[in-house]
C-alpha cells in the first residue's frame, strides 16, 4: 500500500497536468485500486489509533482524483437512468453485500463506501469514502456524507444528516463513534466528532462553530461531543444580551450501564 500512496500523492501534486483523456495508465490504475480498497473496507479515510483519530490524506486525494479523471457515464438502474462519474456500490449480481447487510429498495450507496456485516440501510444515501461499521442502522432519508466514519451499533434516525468532508485534505471527517444514537432530523457536520455512547436528541444541529454547552461544568466547547453525552437543542445569551444564539446543550453524561437500564426518551426527558 506504500507504493500506492506514493503514486497517489505524486499524482495529486501534478493533477493539473492531466485530464480524463490524458491520465497516465499507472495513475488511473492506482486511483481505482484505492477506491476498491475503500469499497471493501481494507482502507479507511480515518482510523483510531492509540486513542486518537488519524486521517489518511492520500485516500482523500484518491477520491478527488477519481472525480477528476472519470468520464461521465450513463448508469442503468432498471427503472430509470443516472448520469454520473461514480457508479453505485451494488451494480450487478457479482457485487453482493457482505453477510447480514440489508439494503432496502431506494437506498443509495456510492462506490467507495464500505458497509460492514449486519448493517441495515433503509431508504437512505451513503456517499463515497464513508465507512459504516457493523450493527448500525441508517434510517429512512438519513444521509452519510463523503468520508464520514460511523461506528458500531449506531442508530441514525430518520432524516438525520452526517456531513461529508473532502477538503481541506488535513481536516478530520465527521465521526460518530460506537453505540451512539442520533435523533431524527439532527445534523452533525464539518468534521464534528460525537464520541462513544452519546445520545443526540431530535433536531440538534452541530457544526464547528456551534457552541456546545455542558450544563454540569458550565464549559463551552466546539467540535466535539464527549463520550456518554446526552445532548438537546437549546440557546445561550449573546455577550451583549440582545439575542440568544443557538447551541447544543449537554444535559448530562451517562455510562453504558445506565444507558442499558434507562430508555432514550427517559434520558432526554430528564434533561
From Swiss-Prot:
It is an enzyme of class 2 (transferase). Substrate binds at residues 102, 139. It holds the Pfam family Hexapep_2. One of its GO terms (cellular component) is cytoplasm. Homotrimer. Belongs to the transferase hexapeptide repeat family. This is 2,3,4,5-tetrahydropyridine-2,6-dicarboxylate N-succinyltransferase.
Amino acid at each position: 500500500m506504500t507504493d500506492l500512496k506514493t503514486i497517489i500523492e505524486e499524482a495529486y501534486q501534478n493533477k493539473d497536468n492531466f485530464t480524463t483523456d490524458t491520465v497516465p495508465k499507472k495513475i488511473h490504475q492506482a486511483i481505482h485500486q484505492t477506491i476498491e480498497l475503500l469499497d471493501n473496507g481494507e482502507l479507511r479515510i480515518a482510523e483510531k489509533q492509540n486513542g486518537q483519530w488519524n486521517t489518511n490524506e492520500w485516500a482523500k486525494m484518491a477520491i478527488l482524483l477519481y472525480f477528476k479523471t472519470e468520464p461521465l457515464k450513463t448508469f442503468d438502474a432498471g427503472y430509470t437512468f443516472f448520469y454520473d462519474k461514480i457508479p453505485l456500490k451494488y451494480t450487478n449480481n457479482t457485487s453482493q453485500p457482505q453477510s447480514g447487510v440489508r439494503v432496502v429498495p431506494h437506498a443509495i450507496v456510492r462506490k467507495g463506501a464500505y458497509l460492514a456485516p449486519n448493517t441495515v440501510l433503509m431508504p437512505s444515501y451513503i456517499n463515497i469514502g464513508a465507512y459504516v461499521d457493523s450493527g448500525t442502522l441508517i434510517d429512512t432519508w438519513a444521509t452519510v456524507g463523503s468520508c464520514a466514519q460511523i461506528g458500531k451499533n449506531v442508530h441514525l434516525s430518520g432524516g438525520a444528516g452526517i456531513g461529508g468532508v473532502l477538503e481541506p485534505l488535513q481536516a478530520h471527517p465527521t465521526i460518530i463513534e460506537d453505540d451512539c444514537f442520533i435523533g431524527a432530523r439532527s445534523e452533525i457536520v464539518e468534521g464534528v466528532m460525537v464520541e462513544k455512547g452519546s445520545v443526540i436528541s431530535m433536531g440538534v444541529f452541530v457544526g464547528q462553530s456551534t457552541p456546545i454547552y455542558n450544563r454540569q461544568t458550565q464549559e463551552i466547547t466546539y467540535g466535539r461531543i464527549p463520550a456518554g453525552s446526552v445532548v438537546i437543542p437549546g440557546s445561550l445569551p449573546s455577550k451583549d444580551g440582545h439575542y440568544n444564539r443557538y447551541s447544543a446543550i449537554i444535559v448530562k453524561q451517562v455510562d453504558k450501564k445506565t444507558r442499558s437500564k434507562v430508555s432514550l426518551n427517559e434520558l432526554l426527558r430528564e434533561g
